[in-house]
């Protein structure tokens, strides 16, 4: 990773400029062009160094969310995971080595909508979701220290 990419990640991993043209503002701060910032972000994402650019919302204030899991027979896991991914309310899902082997996060406007989606998933898959709503959030600093240059 080159110096500009490191500086870009180090400076903006905890917040983007809140303005009409955030990438232009980032470019001005970093001393490069807006096109260069956008290209770096695309490259970092393609290389797997960056998973996404976007807000981190406090979902408990913006609506409702829950962590859910399904115990999926191994031979159905791929099909069920693909189906779960099609729900707009599903942020992401992942496989685990456990009886409950497919985990996913659901977000919705309110708890009633979450319950409807969980019921739909149960009807759709024939599997009963384990619903694990958050009780309390313990926030941690997710920033990673990055050297300016090597």
Curated annotation (Swiss-Prot):
MF terms (GO), sorted A to Z: lyase activity
Annotated keywords: Lyase
Keyword Lyase: yes
Result of knocking out the encoding gene: The nirDLGH mutant lacks dissimilatory nitrite reductase (NIR) activity. The NIR activity is restored by adding purified heme d1.
Pathway: Porphyrin-containing compound metabolism
InterPro entries noted in UniProt: AsnC_trans_reg2, HTH-Siroheme_Decarb, NirdL-like_HTH, Tscrpt_reg_AsnC-like, WH-like_DNA-bd_sf
EC numbers on record: 4.1.1.111
Similarity remark: Belongs to the Ahb/Nir family.
Main function: Involved in heme d1 biosynthesis. Catalyzes the decarboxylation of siroheme into didecarboxysiroheme.
Subunit text: Probably forms a complex composed of NirD, NirL, NirG and NirH. All proteins are required for the total conversion of siroheme to didecarboxysiroheme.
Name of the featured protein: Siroheme decarboxylase NirD subunit
The species this protein was found in: Pseudomonas aeruginosa (strain ATCC 15692 / DSM 22644 / CIP 104116 / JCM 14847 / LMG 12228 / 1C / PRS 101 / PAO1)
Lineage: Bacteria, Pseudomonadati, Pseudomonadota, Gammaproteobacteria, Pseudomonadales
Name of encoding gene: nirD
């Amino acid at each position: 990773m080159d110096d500009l990419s490191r500086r870009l990640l180090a400076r903006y991993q905890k917040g983007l400029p809140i303005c009409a043209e955030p990438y232009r503002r980032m470019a001005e701060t970093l001393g490069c062009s807006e096109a260069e910032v956008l290209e770096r972000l695309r490259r970092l994402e393609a290389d797997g160094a960056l998973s996404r650019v976007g807000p981190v919302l406090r979902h408990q204030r913006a609506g409702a969310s829950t962590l859910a899991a399904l115990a999926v027979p191994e031979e159905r896991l791929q099909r069920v995971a693909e189906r779960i991914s099609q729900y707009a309310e599903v942020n992401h899902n992942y496989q685990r080595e456990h009886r409950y082997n497919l985990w996913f996060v659901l977000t919705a406007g309110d708890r009633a909508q979450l319950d409807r989606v969980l019921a739909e998933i149960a009807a759709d898959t024939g599997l009963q979701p384990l619903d694990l709503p958050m009780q309390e959030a313990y926030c941690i600093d997710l920033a990673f220290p990055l050297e300016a240059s090597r």
